[in-house]
Structure formats: C-alpha cells, structure tokens
Amino acid sequence: MDLVKTHNLLPEGVSTTDARSIEFATEVINCLPYEPNDEQMELLAAFAHFMLYGHPQAVMLVNGYAGTGKTSMIGGIVKALTCRGRKTVLLAPTGRAAKVFTEYSGHTAYTIHRKIYRQNSYLSDGFSLAENKHTDTIFIVDEASMISNSSEGSFFGTGRLLDDLIHYVYSGIGCRLVLMGDVAQLPPVGQSESPALNAEFLRSYALQIYSVNLKQIARQAAESGILFNATILRNVMESGVLCAPKLELLRFDDIDNVTGEFLLETISDSYDRDGMSETIVVTRSNKRATLFNRGIRNSILYREDELVSDDMLLVSKNNYYWANDYEQIDFIANGDVVRVKRVWGEIERRYGLDFANVTVEFPDHGNTEMDVKIILNCLSSDTPALTATQSEMLYTSVMAELTGDKRTRYRELKKNPYFNALQVKYAYAITCHKAQGGQWQNVFIDMGAIMPDAFSQLDFYRWLYTAITRARSQVYLINCPLDTDMPSF
C-alpha cells in the first residue's frame, strides 16, 4: 500500500525553467535562511509556474513530511509574494493551526470557517457560504490533512468543508488555491484518508493539478531525534509492511522513554521550565485523557476544587451562542483551548447538571476574554461531551419551563444560557485528533494502553507519527511498548 505517490505531478507540457519562473524562485531563495535542496527547488519551480502560468482552475497540492522544510519554504514563498505585491490569504482548519501558521509565515492566518462562512442571522441555525470578494488572490491552506468532506452534523454551508472551500476560492475572480499538509498524519475523524491531499479526488472538481511531494529531510533537521523517529514511522507506512519498528532514542537528546515512576516529576519539570501552555499529554482515547487530567490536577497542580483560575479547558462541542458579541471570534469551535481567568459565584445545579459562570481567555485568538456559562459534568467524564441522554434531558427540561407555541419556545431556547452552556474538558491531556494542527515545546505520548495488534494497523502509525510531530523541542514516550535502543529512565 502506497501512502502517497512518490513522484511529482505537473500538468502536461509544463516547463519550470523559463526566465520568469527562475526569477521568482530566486526571490524566494533570498527570503530563506538556507540553501534549498533539490526537492525544495522543484517545489519553487512548480509554484512559480502555478502562479505565473497556471490555468484559472489550477490547484497546487504540497505534501511535505515532517522535517522536509515545507513550512519554511512556504514562509519564504509568502514573503516573496508579499514583496511582489501579490495578494495572499493564509488559512488553517483550526484556531491553533492558524496561530502556528501565523508564527512561521510572519503573516496573519485565519481559520477556514471564519473566512468562508457568514452567520445567516442572529440566533439562526447555521452559517452560509460567504461571497468571495477577493480578486487575483492566492489562498494558502496549511494542515490540509485535517479538512473533511463529510457532512455529518455540520451547521456550515453544505456541511462538506472541502467542497465549500473550493467553491468559495474559485468563485473569486483570478483566485486560486494551495493545499499543503502531510499525508502521514491522521486523516479527518471517520475517514480513511485526507481528501484535500488526494490529487485524484481533487481532479473530480475539474481542477488542473500541480502536486509536489517533499520527502528529503532538510539538512537543518537531520540531527533531530524527533524527526529521525518520525521518518522511521513514515518509512514503515510507505513500505506497506506494518511491523513494529525499533525506535532510536539513545543518540538523541530530544526524545526519551519515561516510565510511570518518573512521569509526574518529568511533567512537573516541563511545567516549571516552559509552562503549562507549552506542555501536552497526547492519548489514544478520551478515557485515557480523563485519567491523565485527573492525575495532573491532583498530583502536580494540587487542585482540589473542580474548577479554579488558570485551569486549561478544551471545548468539546461547537458553540454559536457566546461569541455573538465578540468581533474577534465568530463561534467557539470544538477543539479550542481556553484558560479560566475567574470563576464567578457558586456552582448552579439545574436540569440534572452542574453549571459555573466563568471568564475565560482564548490563547489562540489573541487572548480574547469572554464571559460564559460552562457545564462541569463533562470535565471528569470518559465521553468527549454530554451523552445523548444528558443532552435530551437538558433539552426537555429547559423546554418545559418555556411558554408559548412550539416555534416561540424554540426561539427562546436558542437564547437560553443553560441550554447553550459550553461543554468542556480539561486540556492538560487530549486525544491526538484534538492536538492535530498544534505544536508544543514538550509532548508526552501515552503508549501504556496500546495492544500488540495495533502494530499491524495503519491508524496506529499515523497516530504516533502525528503525536511525535506535535513537539517543537522534546518528546517523552510514556511506557513505550515498541522496541527501542535504550532503557526507560
């Protein structure tokens, strides 16, 4: 099984050695702090032709594995385009991914949802596709592996994000799209592959395809244990022979195996050194995340109350109610991380649930502060959000208190702060899908509950690869069941 085609795909007859293409490539090179390798030069040449001569319905697909310099190359391309006065819009699937994109590109990136959708009206049930008023603009989307085309339970446009993104971009005069990501990462939840990184799937939109695949580890990353071991996993996936690889840790300082005996101490040291916002535990399930969150709050942070100031929380369900009065945030997204600034008053117990009034800030949205009501019951549960039974109980209990005909009561329900309370989990340990698109200085990867049969499943390797590549500086493998070249400390 091939993870990705091993050759680049360019439209028939494309030449990337003309003077204008070479001129643009030179401009990008001047924006880079290093000399590009051969693969990176191929990317520059292909992008130059895409920009200068590509069909109006052309799309560029950039797959770059961890350590291949994809992000720095795109950063250089954005700088060169800006110097030329060429308009660009940078997008990412989540607020956290947009923040990372902003940091490495030097230009503001937005979430896809914020850019391409508009709310139908206050208290409406959804968002419509907005009009693309941009002209002659290149839309560059990072972390495209996260873009789904499934319509289940979506309030946005057609519900198929990739369809809507493509329709939005190409409805603008002279606008084109660049999709970049890493096919070795986890695909969207419930999908076997990432449709936005699949050239054949994109061709079904009648688009002209430019596809470049970066595989060569950049010289600057060659000494990284994180990237060395990510490459081991990638090679296993590409080979199609899924057998447990031997990880190499001994000669690297940035990846270690840690046992439970030293885990709390090591996490605590990471908090002291880099802060809670730069340390994350990545797990395989919500149940494991709940166990780690409980242990961290009890044994490292010594927090006895269920919710206190400085608690980090993860939003577990989209919410369209609380952000209405805030220009910076259109809606609160599933996966957004918030920090508790203040807890107001006493816990309210209503409708069989516990509620708290809090002020939170959004680190991935310019530290915007917002007063919200949250549901506490999800914090310590093994489910990602309220169960179907709890949700139904909340709905029927609130509706029973409202008066008027069914339409009037439903309109009032949409205004009810209890029905619209934020559903949140603790954010010290999260699942890998929730971590995707983000980066932290220190990443602890929970491998203690992994069964041997996982080693024959592609999903396991994608999960571990995605988790390892969330780290900027240090990876700790917790009770790693894979063979390594060093003992646990």
Give the predicted meaning of each segment:
Residues D2-A58:
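Pre-P-loop entry segment of helicase/translocase ATPase cores
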Residues D18-F24, F47-A48, H55, Y170-C175, ...:
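Conserved helicase motor core of P-loop NTPases
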Residues P36, L90, V281:
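Conserved SAM-binding loop
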Residues Q40, T94, S285, G437:
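Short, conserved phosphate/pyrophosphate- and ester-handling motifs at nucleotide-, phospho-/glycolipid
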Residues L43, L313, V338, W440-V443:
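Generic structural signal for buried aliphatic residues
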Residues L44-A45, H49, G54-C243, L250:
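ASCE P-loop NTPase helicase motor core
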Residues G106, I296-I300, R462-W463:
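Short, solvent-exposed amphipathic alpha-helical segments in soluble enzyme
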Residues R349-F489:
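C-terminal accessory regions
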